[in-house]
Curated annotation (Swiss-Prot):
Family, as annotated: Belongs to the sorting nexin family.
CDD domains from the UniProt entry: PX_SNX19
Residue ranges occupied by any PXA domain in the UniProt entry: 95-273
Ranges of residues in domain PX: 538-668
Annotated InterPro entries: Phox_assoc (IPR003114), PX_dom (IPR001683), PX_dom_sf (IPR036871), SNX19_PX (IPR037909), Sorting_nexin_C (IPR013937)
Cellular localisation: Early endosome membrane; Cytoplasmic vesicle membrane
Cystine bridges: none
Keywords: Cytoplasmic vesicle, Endosome, Exocytosis, Lipid-binding, Membrane, Protein transport, Transport
List of residues binding a 1,2-diacyl-sn-glycero-3-phospho-(1D-myo-inositol-3-phosphate): 587, 634
Residue span of region Disordered: 313-333, 413-437, 697-728
Protein name, UniProt field: Sorting nexin-19
């Protein structure tokens, strides 16, 4: 009840207060109205002085009440609220143009700096796509980090750096001017500058500078490159060295050039001033400038010498007649024309001696299909693989070539052995057969140089009949060549016409081979098949006894040769199945790793419960090399194990089984227990380089430390004549480099085997050997013995941090003095301006004048700096910067073959004047008129003069780089920088790495 009586009372009180407030507001309005009327009456009827007094009192009252609207809490005048400073509006067109500039730059980098050397070792089209994706990932990560950078802090640090630099330069200039009256030399100015301020650690000596640049590149790649790229030690070492020596150091040298600084200022600020006058708009597309006009056809006639009789003619050697309406061909095509005419006689000469090569009809050994073709003992086409086998494709063009080649094969009467390396052909021409004497000589060399390797040839008798039938098939005269099925026409469209060094082996006796036209032979890589793949006819055809080197010596082990076929399991195959034949060598340890990895997968564990693996099959057998009976028993059981796994679709299509069978990977890589993430770029580069070395040096060095046996051990082992004959014709392929990638002491193994097989020491004289030993001793003395495990390339943290000591201390003091002040940038800018005004306007440098300027113009300058930084870092500007950089490297979109001629002193002086005028245009016109044109010009001249010393500019570049790395959150990872290139700075270790890779 009490609550009910209280609530009406409270409601009455609130209602009465509301009424009183309304009355008071109405009274105020009445008072104001009366006051205005009274003033009007006084103005019209009474004294004018009284009106002036009343108006002055009202102005004072308004100023007191309205001060909060103009002045902030700090007591500064906010003029920016009355002066509008516009920023660049967001423009989708600018974003699109920036993306285009990035894509063009990436494509030009890949075209001129990546594919220029990669095409010399491989023509894998997927490499370009992988490289482009990796570089785009790097750019995306860089843009993400740049988007979260505190622009306020960046501007503060840069202004502080400029202020410290300008002050140090003025002091150094005064110190050198006092010492001597003659003109100051650049070296003397740099010495005086170093006495005033501590130079960047990278400027101590050239070696330290290279080390510092290498560490920065390594850090940037580690943080920005998407995983798993550059995870391998060798790959990252190569990329770091290439970028450091060919990109970063030349770029720093270019940026430190005073003339280049003038050009940059003219290009940026002149364009910026023009855009400000015309209105903000995105930069126009420059696609017309980037792509020079190239005529579509040229009157090009290439005359070729007539080929010897009995050799098939090639369309590439026929005269080519092209017409053109263009008045003159482009220089690039003229150079290509000269190169073709100049290289053609040499290529024909190489063709005569049998050392020519081609990628058009060249047997390609870079794919994963025939990575172990050298040990294809059981293949019925092993002898036929020594021939020049042409790819059967549709069309009159290739059909004529195949018929000519088969006719040449039929007339030769002798087979040319290639020792597993494939036929060698000139580009655009097919292979030729060597005379019989060359064949016999090649076989004799093969017998003498072949390593001693034990190979089981249990299936040899079964395959001899197949070999005879296929040989008879080729000997049939006037037999038309079968055309390639229509399902493989896409190969002709892509222009990829490569051959494998060996024809695929036909199935075993369970599926006898038919004529060549009864099956579709695919010589394409199945690294990225169009559909699921069915594994069939899997068998372990033989064993190889090899050796590996460890700390105690050589230890033998057994490799099991696994062969299988793959068929694309597609519903739209229209009756024609695409067959591919694979061979891979695996040791027993890798079978155990396969079983372990399958058991660790929860989704696959249920499928292998009833499959007996190696652990269950051989509980009592030792791990070492065993006698032939146990090896034969193990071979049959391991074959049964693999067949059971492939019979289960879920396991057969699993990543583990396909990696074990080297279906989508390189067969040279070992199958380890824990999979090591290697990017496709690293795999393709390693595969291409290794295959190129195999082709270039087929017999110079052993392919693995287990390939060659000593003569004493060979003599101590009883062998039959049949095995000796088989071993003299075959050698162990390089498909088992894999243990070197999976064992801790891999480098020592590869280094040892390459030095052991190196024949350089056999031709060195005694004096050469002594000089070599002396050089190695000196290199070993250079290496720090006290810290052998420390990464020499890893830049010490003090190198990065100490370069910013002065700037960081100043920034910390500013942050401590006013961490939340609204005019931090303006305060730093005023300090920088005082250095410029001290000589011309000393009356402006007094303390009272500084406080007055800070109160009146502080917030306005702060706002102006923020807007200018936003405008200079907008997408329109980034597109312009990237375009300028790209045009400086690729003028007209083409990388110049020769360096540009040096600029004359007159050109440099003219550019300096233009840069000075561009800086003058940055200031508003009314401010220039107030301060004086000549005095402003003298101040800006002092700024340009401080950038005329290349060493000082280099010091500033490194300091600025440290600031950017810190704000990009990269400098915090210096201590975590992986020792991926630990041998890069040590000459002795560098040699070791170069040999081991």
């Amino acid at each position: 009840m009490k609550a009910q009586t209280v609530s009406p009372t409270q409601g009455t009180i609130s209602e009465s207060s509301y009424v009183h407030s309304n009355l008071w507001s109405s009274r105020k309005l009445m008072i104001v109205g009366v006051l205005v009327g009274w003033l009007l009456v006084i103005h019209l009827l009474v004294n004018m002085w009284l009106l002036i007094l009343l108006c002055a009192s009202l102005v004072a009252l308004g100023g007191w009440l309205g001060s909060t609207a103009i002045l902030g809490a700090s007591g500064q005048l906010h003029l920016e609220r009355f002066i509008t400073i516009t920023t660049c509006p967001p423009c989708p067109e600018a974003e699109r143009q920036l993306e285009q500039e990035i894509n063009r730059t990436i494509q030009m980098i890949i075209r001129d700096f990546v594919l220029s050397w990669y095409r010399s070792v491989s023509h894998e089209p997927a490499f370009e796509a992988e490289m482009e994706a990796a570089m785009k990932g790097l750019v995306q990560e860089l843009r993400r980090r740049m988007s979260i950078v505190d622009s306020h802090a960046l501007t503060q640090r840069v202004l502080t750096l400029c202020g410290c630099h300008l002050q140090s330069y003025i002091q150094a200039k005064e110190a050198t001017a006092k010492e001597q009256s003659c003109p100051v030399q650049p070296s003397q100015l740099w010495d005086a500058y170093c006495q005033v301020t501590a130079p960047h650690p990278a400027m101590s000596c050239p070696t330290t500078e290279v080390t510092y640049a290498r560490g920065i590149v390594n850090l940037i790649l580690k943080e920005l490159v998407p995983k798993p790229h550059l995870e391998t030690r060798t790959g990252r070492h190569v990329v770091v060295e290439v970028i450091t020596c060919n990109v970063i150091l030349p770029l720093i040298s270019k940026l430190s050039d005073p003339d280049w600084i003038h050009l940059i200022l003219v290009s940026i600020f002149s364009k910026y001033r023009h855009d400000a006058a015309q209105g903000t708009k995105p930069p126009c597309s420059s696609s017309v400038l980037e792509q020079p006009s190239v005529p579509t056809s040229l009157p090009l006639i290439v005359e070729v010498e007539s080929l010897p009789v009995g050799k098939a003619s090639s369309p590439a050697t026929a005269p080519v007649h092209l017409t053109s309406s263009e008045p003159a061909p482009s220089p690039e095509i003229e150079e290509g024309h000269e190169a073709v005419e100049g290289d053609l006689p040499g290529m024909l000469e190489e063709k005569k001696v049998g050392n020519s090569s081609s990628h058009f009809l060249q047997p390609d050994i870079r794919g994963p299909l025939f990575l172990c073709e050298d040990s294809e003992l059981e293949s019925p086409l092993s002898e036929l693989s020594k021939e020049t086998i042409l790819l059967m494709t549709p069309g009159n063009f290739l059909s004529d070539r195949i018929q000519d080649a088969l006719c040449a094969l039929d007339d030769s009467g002798a087979l040319e052995p290639k020792d597993g390396e494939g036929s060698e052909c000139m580009e655009g021409a097919e292979a030729e057969e060597a005379p019989g004497t060359d064949t016999e000589t090649g076989m004799l060399v093969s017998v003498l140089n072949c390593p001693e390797i034990q190979i089981d040839t249990a299936d040899k008798e079964v395959e001899q009949g197949d070999d005879t039938s296929l040989t008879a098939l080729l000997e049939e005269p006037e037999k038309p060549c079968p055309l390639r099925p229509s399902c493989l026409d896409k190969d002709l469209a892509s222009g990829v016409c490569s051959l494998e060094p060996a024809m695929p082996p036909v199935p075993l006796s369970s599926s006898p081979p038919g004529p060549l036209s009864s099956a579709t032979f695919s010589f394409e890589s199945l690294s990225s098949p169009d559909g699921p793949v069915v594994i069939q006819n899997l068998r372990i055809t033989g064993t190889i006894t090899a050796r590996e080197h460890s700390g105690t010596g050589f230890h033998p082990y057994t490799l099991y040769t696994v062969k299988y076929e793959t068929v694309l399991n597609g519903e739209n195959s229209s009756g024609l199945q695409q067959l591919a034949y694979h061979t891979v060598n695996r040791r027993y340890r890798e079978f155990l790793n396969l079983q372990t990895r399958l058991e660790e997968k929860p989704d696959l564990r249920k499928f292998i419960k009833n499959v007996k693996g190696p652990k269950k099959l051989f509980p009592d057998l030792p791990f070492g090399n065993m006698d032939s009976d146990r090896v034969e028993a193990r071979k049959s059981l391991l074959e049964s194990f693999l067949k059971q796994l492939c019979a289960i679709p879920e396991i057969g299509n699993s990543e583990e089984v396909q990696e074990f069978l080297a279906l989508n990977t390189d067969a040279r890589i070992a199958f380890v227990k824990k999979p090591f993430m290697v990017s496709r770029i690293d795999k393709m580069v390693v595969s291409a380089i290794v295959d190129t070395l195999k082709t270039a040096f087929p017999r110079s060095e052993p392919q693995s430390p287990t390939e060659e046996l000593s003569e004493a051990e060979n003599e101590s082992k009883p062998q039959t004549e049949g095995k000796k004959a088989s071993k003299s014709r075959l050698r162990f392929s390089s498909s088992k480099i894999a243990p070197a990638l999976s064992i801790a002491e891999a480098q020592d193994k590869i280094l040892y085997c390459l030095q052991e097989g190196n024949s350089e020491s056999e031709v060195l004289s005694m004096s050469g050997m002594e000089s070599f030993i002396e050089k190695q001793t000196k290199l070993l003395r250079i290496q720090p013995a006290e810290v052998p495990d420390k990464d020499p390339q890893q830049v010490p943290k003090e190198y990065v941090d100490s370069g910013l000591l002065d700037k960081a201390v100043v920034a910390q003091e500013l942050n401590k003095s006013g961490p939340g002040t609204e005019t931090e940038l303006a305060d730093t800018a005023f300090d920088l301006i005082l250095l410029l005004l001290m000589e011309q306007w000393k009356w402006l440098c007094t303390e009272s004048m500084q406080k007055f300027l800070h109160i009146i113009f502080g917030t306005l300058v702060q706002r102006w700096l923020e807007v200018q930084v936003a405008n200079l870092t907008c997408p329109q500007r980034w597109a312009q910067y990237l375009h300028l950089l790209r045009e400086s490297i690729w003028p007209g979109g083409v990388l110049p073959k020769f360096p540009r001629p040096g600029r004359t002193q007159a050109q440099k002086a003219a550019t300096e004047k233009q840069a000075l005028q561009s800086l003058m245009d940055l200031l508003p016109d009314f401010l220039v008129e107030i301060l004086g044109v000549n005095k402003c010009r003298l101040s800006w001249s002092l700024v340009l003069e401080s950038f005329q010393q290349p060493l000082i500019n280099r010091h500033l570049i490194y300091c600025l780089g440290d600031i950017i790395l810190e704000l990009l959150d990269l400098s915090a990872s210096v201590e975590e920088c992986a020792p991926a290139t630990s041998a890069s700075d040590s000459p002795g270790s560098l040699k070791k790495m170069a040999v081991s890779t």
